[in-house]
Structure formats: structure tokens, C-alpha cells
UniProtKB/Swiss-Prot annotation:
Localization (cell): Nucleus
The protein's name in its UniProt record: Oxysterols receptor LXR-beta
Chain's gene name: NR1H2
Post-translational modification, as annotated: Sumoylated by SUMO2 at Lys-404 and Lys-442 during the hepatic acute phase response, leading to promote interaction with GPS2 and prevent N-Cor corepressor complex dissociation.
Cited InterPro entries: Liver_X_rcpt, NHR-like_dom_sf, Nucl_hrmn_rcpt_lig-bd, Nuclear_hormone_rcpt_NR1, Nuclear_hrmn_rcpt, Znf_hrmn_rcpt, Znf_NHR/GATA
Annotated region described as Transactivation AF-1, given as residue ranges: 1-80
Organism for this UniProt entry: Bos taurus
């Protein structure tokens, strides 16, 4: 990946990493899936509806980039629904796509301490929709939290007052500046934006990153990425019933059971690849690249994005990883599916390390976008253009982390260093796939193409 530049942090990212990994399923759903490696010799390949090529997937429903207009940040697709009540969402508030009503309700509940005053007459099991949200405040607040709204994102009255004062001071400085209104020179990433998460004060850092604000363009970018991920995840949920069931028979070592496990993980990998491609097409700037570069970037980054999403689904209490809605796997399950211990252990170690960082949806989305736009990937025709497209995401992540964790100056470089770790894992993945080839295992055409598995 090319080395992104910032004005304050000089953290080297991976240089010319290993050549594009060969293949091996890495599946995902809500995130990616694992990747079978040293699989059982007698397990046949799984060829099916997954025979689409990368080019075909890129061509499918390809949408031109939307023109951006000045003014309030528009919704990315126009049909997002509130994750609390199902009404039309107005934006990304307090870490969740939600409507204005639920945004205001959550803010008032936190500021006024509503959690202790609300009571449900139905035993706390009300199904929340646009009608019931007015009937049961307790269940509405519960649904807000279940959807992911965070109390720490809500600004207190005192914080709002200080924020208004700072904004007024900035406006006065801009008006008195000889260069006129513009971006403050005190911070390379500052600008007339809002704290992470929305202009309503729904930012992760409660606006405490002194001197740093997200620009309006950065705020819109983050909203677009998070909304795109949510939409792609939901699409993949619909494929869950089509996946070959995990064998639960009496003899887990039978040939049929091994075949089913291999097919199961391979099909999850295909869902993951399709989801990643769908997401990449919605990342601002990706479709501006030539077709050759789009394919080169996807081939090289897919396994790394799968591993990022795998870490995102890691549960430290159960030490399991969940894909799609409710497919949960332990280390033993990964091994039974055909992966080698040499690949399984690093996956779980990486997942634990990512959990310690505590990334939110916006940070994961930005990190994935940075990973996609890696100019040093093999066969990239216009590396300078790719690097230029990557830089705004690096700048946005830097500003976002400064606002969210202003006291943790090492958070941003730690996140970038995880991309270096992904290059190492990608190399281990290549060895995993080589084991498959030695055993004459054939992957479905899509996985063979995305990871350059040559017969």
C-alpha cells in the first residue's frame, strides 16, 4: 500500500507487499469469511452460481458517482431506514442511521436521564415501529441502544455551549482574516464541519478535539461509507439461507461432512467477495479509476478486507467469530473447515489486537477505504492517481481519531500499522492457498480469479 502522508504523523505503511495472494476462501457476511487452506484431500471443489468473474461483478449494477451539491449532507442512497423505528433515516446520528425523531428522543433521554423514568406496560418486549415509538419510551430507548446509539456521543448542555462559543470565535476569525473565510491553518484537517457522527453533536469524541473538526466533505464521506457498508451487509444477509448447511451429523470426520464444511466456507467466501466489490463501487473515487486498476486493487485487497471484517466480528468473551446473521465459529470450526493452524492463530491474534483498539463503524469504513486505495499493488497502471484518491481518507481518519480520542496521540499510527500486519497475514494466506493447490483442490471460478489461482 502506498504511504499516506499527513502533516503531523509520519507512520510508514506497507511498501511493496507480497504479490496478490493466490486463493482460498475467506468468507464474510456482515464481514468476510474464513479461507480454507490445507483442506482434506478428498473434498471436491464447489462450483456453483459463484462462477461470476470480477469483471462481471464490477459491471453489475454499476452506478455513476453522484454529483455532490453544496448544503446539508444528503443521504447516500435516499432509501435508508431508521435502525430504531423503520421510518426514513435523515442521517448518521450517535453512531446509527436514524430519523430525526429517534435522534432527538435519544438525545433528550440521555440529557434528562430518561432511562430511570421510563416504564413499559408490556414487559419490555414491544416491537418498535413508527407507531409504537410514541407509545413506549422504554422500549424505544432500548432499541436505540441495541441499534448502536452511544450515550458518550451526546453532547451535554455545557459542551454544546462551549461548542457554540468556539464556532462563533472561528467565524469571527475567518471574517477578520485577510484571506477571508476558509479552512483554519491551525490544523491541516480542520474546517467548518462537525464532530464525528453528524452535525447534531453525535460525534464519538463529544467535540473535545480542540482545534480539529471534520470538514463538511469529510463528514459526508464518512456518512456515505458507513451507509454503504450497512446496505451491503443487509444484501448479504439474504444469501444466508442459500449457504450449504454446516454438518451436524454423528460422524464429523466422514467424507460427506468434510465436503459440506468445505462447501460451507467456500460459499461464505463468495458472499464476502461480492459484498466487498459492492462496497468498493460505492466508495467515492473508486469508479473514477480505469477498469484495470479497479480489478488490480480488488484482487490485492480482498483478503485483507476480509480479515478486517473478521476481526470486527470477533467476540472476546466466547473467542468466536460470527458471520452473516448468526453463523458463529470457534478456532476448532476453522480447523475443521480446512484451515491450517499456521493461518488460524494469526487470524485470532489479529482480531484480538483490533478489538483492543476499539474501532467504531466509521473508523473501520475509513480504514477499509484506505486499504482499497493502495497504490503499490501489483499491476496498478496509475499509482499516483490511486494515491491521490487515498489521501482524503487518511486525512479524514486522522481528524476523526483526534476528535474521538484527543488524549491518545498514538491511536492513529496504531491503526495504520494494522494495515502493515494485514500485508503479513496476506502472505500467510498465500501459503494457505498453496497447500490447497498441492492437494489438487479447486476453488470456484470467482475465488480462483480474485486470488489469481492458476491451474
Amino acid at each position: 500500500m502506498s504511504t499516506p502522508t499527513t502533516n503531523s504523523v509520519d507512520t510508514p505503511l506497507p511498501g511493496n507487499g507480497p504479490s496478490t495472494p493466490s486463493s482460498s476462501p475467506g468468507g464474510k457476511e456482515d464481514g468476510p469469511e474464513p479461507c480454507p487452506g490445507g483442506a482434506d484431500p478428498d473434498v471436491p471443489s464447489t462450483d456453483g452460481a459463484d462462477s461470476a468473474s470480477v469483471v462481471v461483478i464490477l459491471d453489475t449494477a454499476e452506478e455513476p458517482e453522484r454529483k455532490r451539491k453544496k448544503g446539508p449532507a444528503p443521504k447516500m442512497l435516499g432509501d435508508e431506514l431508521c435502525q430504531v423505528c423503520g421510518d426514513t433515516a435523515s442521517g448518521f446520528h450517535y453512531n446509527v442511521l436514524s430519523c430525526e425523531g429517534c435522534k432527538g428522543f435519544f438525545r433528550r433521554s440521555v440529557i434528562r436521564g430518561g432511562a430511570g423514568r421510563y416504564a413499559c406496560r408490556g414487559g419490555g418486549t414491544c416491537q418498535m415501529d413508527a407507531f409504537m415509538r410514541r407509545k413506549c419510551q422504554q422500549c424505544r430507548l432500548r432499541k436505540c441502544k441495541e441499534a448502536g446509539m452511544r450515550e458518550q456521543c451526546v453532547l451535554s448542555k455545557e459542551q454544546i455551549r462551549k461548542k457554540k462559543i468556539r464556532k462563533q470565535q472561528q467565524q469571527q476569525q475567518q471574517q477578520s482574516s485577510p484571506t477571508g473565510p476558509g479552512v483554519s491553518s491551525s490544523s491541516p484537517a480542520s474546517g467548518p464541519g462537525a464532530s464525528p457522527g453528524g452535525s447534531d453533536g453525535g460525534g464519538q469524541g463529544s467535540g473535545e478535539g480542540e482545534g480539529v473538526q471534520l470538514t463538511a466533505a469529510q463528514e459526508l464521506m464518512i456518512q456515505q461509507l458507513v451507509a454503504a457498508q450497512l446496505q451491503c451487509n443487509k444484501r448479504s444477509f439474504s444469501d444466508q439461507p442459500k449457504v450449504t448447511p454446516w454438518p451436524l451429523g454423528a460422524d464429523p470426520q466422514s467424507r460427506d461432512a468434510r465436503q459440506q464444511r468445505f462447501a460451507h466456507f467456500t460459499e461464505l467466501a463468495i458472499i464476502s467477495v461480492q459484498e466487498i466489490v459492492d462496497f468498493a463501487k460505492q466508495v467515492p473515487g473508486f469508479l473514477q479509476l480505469g477498469r484495470e486498476d479497479q480489478i488490480a486493487l480488488l484482487k490485492a485487497s480482498t483478503i485483507e478486507i476480509m480479515l478486517l471484517e473478521t476481526a470486527r466480528r470477533y467476540n472476546h468473551e466466547t473467542e468466536c467469530i460470527t458471520f452473516l446473521k448468526d453463523f458463529t465459529y470457534s478456532k476448532d470450526d476453522f480447523h475443521r473447515a480446512g484451515l491450517q493452524v499456521e493461518f488460524i492463530n494469526p487470524i485470532f491474534e489479529f482480531s484480538r489486537a483490533m478489538r483492543r483498539l476499539g474501532l467504531d463503524d466509521a473508523e473501520y469504513a475509513l480504514l477499509i477505504a484506505i486499504n482499497i486505495f493502495s497504490a503499490d499493488r501489483p499491476n496498478v497502471q496509475e499509482p499516483s492517481r490511486v494515491e491521490a484518491l487515498q489521501q482524503p481518507y487518511v486525512d479524514a481518519l486522522l481528524s476523526y481519531t483526534r476528535i474521538k480520542r484527543p488524549q491518545d496521540q498514538l491511536r492513529f499510527p496504531r491503526m495504520l500499522m494494522k494495515l502493515v500486519s494485514l500485508r503479513t497475514l496476506s502472505s500467510v494466506h498465500s501459503e494457505q492457498v498453496f497447500a490447497l493447490r498441492l492437494q489438487d483442490k479447486k476453488l470456484p471460478p470467482l475465488l480462483s480469479e480474485i486470488w489469481d489461482v492458476h491451474e
